[in-house]
Structure formats: structure tokens, C-alpha cells
């Protein structure tokens, strides 16, 4: 399946699930392909054919963008290594959940969460350790007794009760023996996958944008490589999607940044190096770099940006 066709399917799934989806854009390389929102759930999605093709750099951008937009990052693909992604299974790439379109459909449309996660050595499940301990104690079984029944050590049983995952085979034996479920489903919409290879501890290496003076005004700057916007600015619990460059380059992206900010319910700004005024294109504040340098603090910038939910009115000064 081509990546464009896969992106169409992902978009259709999210719309079917009641999500509002951002417009398609052609920027390459890109750290994400679309943003989708449904009430309080925001998902930042990267669509690929092969999930191993997602670089650590792209994963870092995807994770940073999702975190600052108040959403969850998600990779959707077809294959991992030489095999197709299993339906109902979750994979992890650089600390980010990766699933197939079918698993996405099951979770978002059918409300059926996945139970299985892929890890070196095969497919595993999470055990509800408290439930397992309660079942064991109800039968007055020691750790060793249950270990003998399942063919594992007492230490392994102790680890299961402390939250360690296990193989499908062992999980089935546990549920058959106690005649009840102990396997926990995986909530894709939570930001807490097992981050053994998480990129979040690494320093971002985005392109340079000369916004050091904004940091001096108390704003935080996060530069990005593969997004329609070059940076995310944060100030006083506000996030600003920020583009930067000459007018010919940036104005083309202003409408897209506006669309993304509307879905994410965040501010949008384009800083233009060869422009000396300010105006609004959609929801995006287009402002000259020289004009931006004249602001006195972050609150003045927020005043220029206006309310997130307000209808933009043309302004040029």
C-alpha cells in the first residue's frame, strides 16, 4: 500500500471515530502527518509504511510536538522488520506507540483496545498484578504453589504481581486456571508507553531560529526539524506554533499553521524576516522580525495573538 493511500485510510478512520482532522500537507521530510482532535483527546500522527524507518530525530520532534500540544504521539504503519504489524498488537519505537491501521480502527472506532505488545522475543501482555495476587491468596496459594502450576519460578510470580508483563502462553494458562481475566488492555491515548528507547532525554537539534531575545522575556523555545512550523514557543501556559523565514517561504505555510493551530486549540505565529508590520492570515499572526523585537514582554505578544477561540479580524499596522 502506498503511503498516500495509507494516510487516506488513517484520515478516514479518525473521521469515522468523530475526530476533526487537520489538512493534508506535502512538506518533506516531516515529523508528523496529521493532527486529530475529539473533545479532550488530541493525537499527533506519523504515517509510514515501515515503522523502523522512523528516525530518532523524527520521533523526538513527534514527541515534543505532542507533549506541548497536550496530546499523544502515535505512529501508524504496515510493517516492522520483515513482518506485517499484528492486528491488536502495539509496538514501541523510541518510546512512541506504533500500530497498524486495523488496530487503530479497532481502538478508535470499535472501542476495542489492544491487549498485546511486541517486544524482543515475541508478543507479550500486561498482567493486573493486584488481581493476580488476590486470586492467589483467595486459594491460599504461595508464590511457589502458583509457580509450580504455571511452570515458572516463585520469583517470576512475584514479578507478575509487581506489574511485569508475560507471554501470551503464560497469560492464557493463568486465566484458564483461575477462570477469570487478569490481562490489562493498552490505552493508546495515554502518554505512558514503556520508554526503554525514548528520545525525550536527548537534546533537540532543530534549525536555528534567532529567538534568543524571546527567551530573555521568559518564553521557552523548542526548535523542530520536520514540522510546518520551525518552533514551538511556550509562555504562561500558552503554546505558540511558530514559523520563521522570508515572506515568500513563510506566508505559504501560514494557512497550514493556522489550520493546525485551530485543531490543536493553540496560538499560531509567522515571523517574517523581510516584513515590517503585522497582520492576521486566518488564525495566524504574521509579524515582521523587527516588529517582534519591539515587544516588551510575553503578555504583549499574547495580546497581539488574540484569543484562541476568537474569529480573526484583518489587521495591518
Swiss-Prot record:
Residues 132-185 form the HTH cro/C1-type domain. It holds the Pfam family HTH_3. One of its GO terms (molecular function) is DNA-binding transcription factor activity. The keyword Nucleotidyltransferase does not apply. Keywords: DNA-binding, Transcription, Transcription regulation. It comes from the Archaea. The keyword 4Fe-4S does not apply. PROSITE patterns: HTH_CROC1. InterPro entries: Arc_TR_HTH (IPR020886), Cro/C1-type_HTH (IPR001387), Lambda_DNA-bd_dom_sf (IPR010982). Residues 143-162 bind DNA. NCBIfam families: PRK04140.1. This is Putative HTH-type transcriptional regulatory protein Mboo_0195. It comes from Methanoregula boonei (strain DSM 21154 / JCM 14090 / 6A8). The lineage of its organism: Archaea, Methanobacteriati, Methanobacteriota, Stenosarchaea group, Methanomicrobia.
Amino acid at each position: 500500500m502506498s503511503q498516500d493511500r495509507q494516510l487516506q485510510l488513517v484520515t478516514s478512520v479518525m473521521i469515522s471515530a468523530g475526530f476533526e482532522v487537520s489538512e493534508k500537507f506535502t512538506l518533506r521530510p516531516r515529523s508528523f502527518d496529521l493532527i486529530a482532535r475529539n473533545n479532550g483527546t488530541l493525537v499527533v500522527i506519523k504515517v509510514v509504511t515501515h515503522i523502523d524507518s522512523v528516525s530518532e530525530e523524527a520521533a523526538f520532534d513527534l514527541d515534543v510536538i505532542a507533549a506541548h500540544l497536550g496530546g499523544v504521539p502515535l505512529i501508524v504503519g504496515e510493517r516492522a522488520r520483515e513482518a506485517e504489524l499484528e492486528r491488536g498488537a502495539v509496538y514501541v519505537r523510541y518510546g512512541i506507540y506504533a500500530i497498524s491501521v486495523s488496530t487503530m480502527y479497532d481502538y478508535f472506532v470499535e472501542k476495542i483496545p489492544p491487549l498485546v505488545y511486541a517486544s524482543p522475543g515475541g508478543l507479550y501482555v500486561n498482567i493486573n498484578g493486584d488481581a493476580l495476587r488476590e486470586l492467589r491468596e483467595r486459594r491460599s496459594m504461595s508464590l511457589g504453589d502458583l509457580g509450580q502450576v504455571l511452570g515458572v519460578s516463585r520469583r517470576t510470580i512475584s514479578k507478575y504481581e509487581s506489574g511485569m508483563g508475560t507471554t501470551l502462553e503464560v497469560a492464557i494458562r493463568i486465566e484458564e486456571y483461575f477462570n477469570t481475566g487478569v490481562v490489562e488492555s493498552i490505552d493508546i491515548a495515554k502518554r505512558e508507553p514503556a520508554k526503554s528507547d525514548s528520545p525525550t532525554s536527548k537534546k533537540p537539534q532543530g534549525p536555528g531560529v534567532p529567538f534568543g531575545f524571546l527567551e530573555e522575556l521568559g518564553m521557552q523555545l523548542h526548535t523542530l526539524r520536520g514540522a510546518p512550523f520551525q518552533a514551538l514557543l511556550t509562555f504562561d501556559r500558552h503554546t505558540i506554533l511558530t514559523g520563521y523565514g522570508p515572506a515568500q517561504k513563510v506566508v505559504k505555510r501560514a494557512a497550514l499553521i493556522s489550520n493546525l493551530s485551530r485543531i490543536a486549540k493553540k496560538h499560531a505565529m509567522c515571523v517574517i524576516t523581510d516584513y515590517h508590520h503585522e497582520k492576521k492570515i486566518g488564525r495566524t499572526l504574521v509579524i515582521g522580525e523587527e516588529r517582534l523585537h519591539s515587544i516588551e514582554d510575553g503578555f504583549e505578544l499574547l495580546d497581539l495573538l488574540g484569543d484562541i477561540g476568537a474569529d480573526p479580524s484583518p489587521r495591518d499596522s
